[in-house]
């Protein structure tokens, strides 16, 4: 991939908003049976920041997932410190401190702390004790990179909130690879020629959430925001689910 393309990709990442967990839970409950035995890919999702990763990690056993894969950048600007790369085998301290792209692959989430529940502490334990659970990526972690495309090919279902400015390109890749997906996009995407064509051809549809209900997203510190809830800055965005 050309340097100019990589630069554009990094710039486009700044338009990403982080979905709140209750919104993910409310939509995913309609698809529970479809996740059993499946490999789920969250390929725009740093677990430090992403509630998509958090949802599927917390519900790994409940949903009966076979595998959960997330590709992302180390470090966090939103949900700092819930998972810590320091001490993870194969990750140098310099990589843990920098925004080094990496892949997390989860195939088992036991109750490691014996408290009867699955929580992020269990996932953190997995990352620090299973050498094949986390590996650094060769590229920048962009969903269009060769290694990330290969991961999408291997996945059964893709679930994420891609950058809105790259929505057309993201959906085009999903359709080209004939992937099942549940993603979030701007409501205006319905009017895009390419997206409207996919909707008309039954290649995708909107989700269960009422289209009249907009969504509130967590935003980084440098963004304008409308209110603070639970210590997080949130902003009202015209968005909906696509599947």
What does each model-identified segment do?
Residues 1-243:
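Class I S-adenosyl-L-methionine-dependent methyltransferase catalytic core
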